[in-house]
Each structure stands twice: as C-alpha cells, then as structure tokens.
Amino acid sequence: MKIWLLLGLLLMHEALEDVTGQHPPKNKRPKEPGENRIKPTNKKVKPKIPKIKDRDSADPTPKTQSIMTQMMDKGRFQKPAATLSLVAGQTLELRCKGNKIGWSYPAYLDTFKDTRLSVKQHERYGQLTLVNSTAADTGEFSCWGQLCTGYVCRRDEAKTGSTYIFFTEKGELFVPSPSHFDVVYLNPDRQAVVPCRVTVLSAKVTLHREFPAKEIPANGTDIVYDLKRGFVYLQPHVGHQGVVYCKAEAGGKSQISVKYQLLYAEVPRGPPSTTILASSNKVKGGDDVSVLCTVLGEPDVEVEFRWTYPGQKDERPVTIQDSWRLIHRGLGHTTRISQSVLSIEDFETIDAGYYICTAQNLQGQTTVATTVESS
C-alpha cells in the first residue's frame, strides 16, 4: 500500500514540472542572454513621421515693404489705404522713406506744369505736397526707392508705396476732361480704354452708345469696367466703333461724361513702316531738290524723324519740315501718315550722295536711304 502511494506522488511531481515550464518545449528556441524578453503583441501602431519644412516651397522673393505714409491732422502720420477719398480743396502730403525716392502721379499735374504740386527730397525721406486739390487730381500716387550706382539709378521693387485717391468735388462725378470730345483708337492686337473715371468711389457707371441710343453692357468678357481706368474693351473690333458716352450716378445725382469717338485702326503695332523718295535722283547744279520720308502707322502713335545727308558735316543749309495727318479709309479704318521733307536750294556738288532717314516710335526704328546725283 505504501509502495503505491509513493509511486503516485512521484508521477504527480513529474507532471507539475512539465506544467511550470522547467523543461523548455522542443519546438521553441531558447532565448540568448540579453535578448529582449518582452512578448510581441498584434496591436498595429502608426509610425510618427517628423514634420519637415519644405524649403523649396517657401517664396524666395522678398516681401514688398510699403514706404509711404500720409500726413494727417496735428502732425500725425499713417500708412494710406489702397484707395482714399478726400474732399477737393484739401492739402495732400505724402512721404516715402529713403534718401533717393522716385514719384509717379496723375499725368494731368505734369502736363500743365502745375505749381500746386511740390516734390522734394530730404535727407531721409521724399515728400510730395499737393495744395488746393481738385477733382481733376484724382488718380494713382506712388513712390519707390532708387538704387544708384554713380548717375545710373534703378527702381528698388522691394521698397514701394502707392495709393489711388478720389478727390470728390461738388458737381463733378467724372474726372474732368480738357476737351468735350475725345478720340479712342481701337486696335485688334491690344485693349482699348474709354477713360470714364469717377471722383466718387461708390458711383455707379454705365456705358452708352449715342446712335442707335442704347446702353452697352459691361459683361466682363468683352467689356469690363475698371474703377481706375474706365471701360476696357478687351478685344476691340470694327463693330465697336461709333460715338459713346458714360453716365454716373451717386447720392441721388447723375452726370453725363464727354463723348468719345471710337475709331478702328487696322495697322498693327511695330516699328515704323517707312519709305523714302527724292523729287529727282539726278539734279543739275543750281536746281532745287527735296527728299520725302513717309511713315504709315497707328493713329495714336507719334513718330520722330532724323536725317543724315552729304553736306551735313560742312553745315550745308537745309530745310526740314515734319507733319502728320489721319486718313479714313472707309469702314471706320484709320491710318496716320507722318512725313518729313528735307529741302535743298541751289544744288551743288557737295550735296550729291546718300540721304538717310531714320523714323522712330516707341516700338523701334526703321532706316531708309536714297541717292541724289549731280547730272
């Protein structure tokens, strides 16, 4: 009986050793010393990716710094808004920080050499002062710093300032025009502007055709209204020609602008199209001779002429006369003819040779030549 009891206890002890894991299973590798003994779990963990600033996406161009301030009452200064409304008669004083400041203001003030305008450069700032302001002074006022090397200066685009100012005046909803009838040329290769600018920011402006009488809608695709420019024809064509005017309404009052004649110009923009012709290419001594230089171009593009001729070095007296006129070629097409005539009296041997004419406009220049010989 005791033998069976001892045998049972021995078998129970063997079973307990297997359960407590004192003998490692044959199908599992024993852990090496120092090996991580933390059991892995099946939980998925989203890796954290550190945020890296994209240097390439940063704008490398420096931010423009506004250098303009406006003189307020009691000696206070503040940066002007993009648009300002001032009552006509007020004094305007603008300052721009810098020891070399360039200015731009409505061309009206330059055209008439207006003494109401004063521009001064001080040691640390530029100053623009306009006294006795009127509705005609409405427009863009801007300034910029200048980077100079010797006598050559260039605009510093990082230091600029600008504001568009409406000078409101009783009875003047439109910026006054020096004439009662203006001409606007329509070119197929660029925008055309009917300059109906107002003096009141909140004014409602419409465009009208005189005959047949109707309103011309500014639909945003063919014609748009720009507060600072007027009605802009985005793609002018022959059908736009005619007489138009603008109507402004503000504060229960309305006003009609001057009339504008829209003329279509078919000559494309570019350097002058120039020809030269002598009254005779063989001239006898003592006779008179003239050389004509002609340019066909756009109606609103001015042309300048320069001459080179045989007797120029010897200061041979010549007469040079420039002129221009518009030619209407039907269907509203208009061309400008600019001419320069060089005339010589009592032709001499010294006058024989090449006569060279150079015509220049804003797009470039063209040089033509002809010979005049002594017969």
UniProtKB/Swiss-Prot annotation:
Its main location: secreted. Keywords: Disulfide bond, Glycoprotein, Immunoglobulin domain, Repeat, Secreted, Signal. Residues 40-50 have a biased composition (Basic residues). GO terms for cellular component: extracellular region. InterPro entries: Ig-like_dom, Ig-like_dom_sf, Ig-like_fold, Ig_sub, Ig_sub2, PDGFRL. It is found in: Secreted. It comes from the Eukaryota. Disulfide bonds join C96-C143, C293-C357. Residues 1-21 form the signal peptide. Residues 20-64 are annotated as: Disordered. Pfam families: Ig_3 (PF13927), VEGFR-1-like_Ig-like (PF21339). Forms a complex composed of PDGFRL, TNK2 and GRB2. This is Platelet-derived growth factor receptor-like protein.
